[in-house]
From Swiss-Prot:
Adopts an immunoglobulin-like beta-sandwich fold forming a hydrophobic cavity that capture N-terminally myristoylated target peptides. Phe residues within the hydrophobic beta sandwich are required for myristate binding. Tetradecanoate binds at residue 132. This is Protein unc-119 homolog B-B. The keyword Manganese does not apply. The keyword Transport applies. The gene is unc119b-b. Belongs to the PDE6D/unc-119 family.
C-alpha cells in the first residue's frame, strides 16, 4: 500500500466513528502468486505484454493489463475520482513475521489536520505515493507481514483485489496478488498481507543498497476486475549507514 509522504510519521484517530469494524479480526491474506526472476518463477510466457502507452489509451483497465507490464510505470493509470467506492487507507504497518518486530508504521492524520494540510495541497499525486527507507537487513527477510486498515464508503465493494509489482531499475523482482474479497458498505476493515520474498543474490542486494530509490513499486487496486486505484512507492535500503 502507498500513501503520501506527509502521513509517514503521524498516528491519527479513526476519522469516522460510524464505520463498522468488519468483524474485529485481522484477516491474513497470502499472495496467490509470486513472480520474479530471483524467485525462480520468471516464466510468464502465457502473459500478453503491454506497454504503458497502450494502457493509457484504454477506458477500462483489468488485471491482465497490469500483469503484462514489464517495467514500472511513469504515470498513474487511473484518476483519484475513479475510486467511486470511497475506499480510504487509514493505517499501514510492516513487521517481520519471524520475530514480530515492527519495521514501519504510518497512520492517516486526524480530520482536522488533514483539512489544514489539504488547504495548502497542490500536488495531484499526494496520497498516492510514499517513500520508504529500510536497513540493508530488510533485503534478507523472507517473510514480512503488511497490516492495512481501510474504510469503505456507501457502496458495497465486490471482489476487491490488489496487484503489487516491485522493480529494480525496471527489472521486475516480484509480483504479488491479493484478494480482499467482499467489503460491506460503511465498514472499517483490517487485514494482513503475508509476503514471502524471493532470495536475492548478494550482487543484487549490493546494487539495491548502493542505489537508493531505484527500487520502485506499483500497487494496483481493482473492484470487480476494474482498476479504481493506483499507488506508487520507492525504496532505499541504506538506512543506518
Amino acid at each position: 500500500m502507498s500513501g503520501s509522504n506527509r502521513e509517514a510519521a503521524l498516528a491519527g484517530q479513526p476519522k469516522d466513528e460510524r464505520k463498522k469494524s468488519g468483524g474485529g479480526v485481522i484477516n491474513r491474506l497470502k499472495a496467490r502468486r509470486v513472480q520474479g526472476k530471483e524467485s525462480g518463477t520468471s516464466d510468464q510466457s502465457s502473459i500478453t505484454r503491454f506497454r504503458e502507452e497502450e494502457l493509457l489509451g484504454l477506458n477500462e483497465l483489468r488485471p491482465e493489463h497490469v500483469l503484462g507490464l514489464s517495467r514500472v510505470t511513469d504515470n498513474y493509470l487511473c484518476k483519484p475520482e475513479d475510486n467511486i467506492f470511497g475506499i480510504d487507507f487509514t493505517r499501514f504497518k510492516i513487521r517481520d513475521l519471524e520475530t514480530g518486530t515492527v519495521l514501519f508504521e504510518i497512520s492517516k492524520p486526524c480530520s482536522e489536520q488533514e483539512e489544514e494540510e489539504e488547504s495548502t495541497h497542490l500536488d495531484a499525486s499526494a496520497g498516492r505515493f510514499v517513500r520508504y527507507q529500510f536497513t540493508p537487513a530488510f533485503l534478507r527477510l523472507r517473510k514480512v507481514g503488511a497490516t492495512v486498515e481501510f474504510t469503505v464508503g456507501d457502496k458495497p465493494v465486490k471482489s476487491f483485489r490488489m496487484i503489487e509489482r516491485h522493480y529494480f531499475r525496471d527489472r521486475i523482482l516480484k509480483s504479488f496478488d491479493f484478494d480482499f474479497g467482499f467489503c460491506i458498505p460503511n465498514s472499517r476493515n483490517t487485514c494482513e498481507h503475508m509476503y514471502e520474498f524471493p532470495q536475492l543474490s548478494e550482487e543484487l542486494i549490493r546494487l539495491m543498497t548502493e542505489n537508493p530509490y531505484e527500487t520502485r513499486s506499483d500497487s494496483f487496486y481493482f473492484v470487480d476486475n476494474k482498476l479504481i486505484m493506483h499507488n506508487k512507492a520507492d525504496y532505499a535500503y541504506n538506512g543506518g549507514q
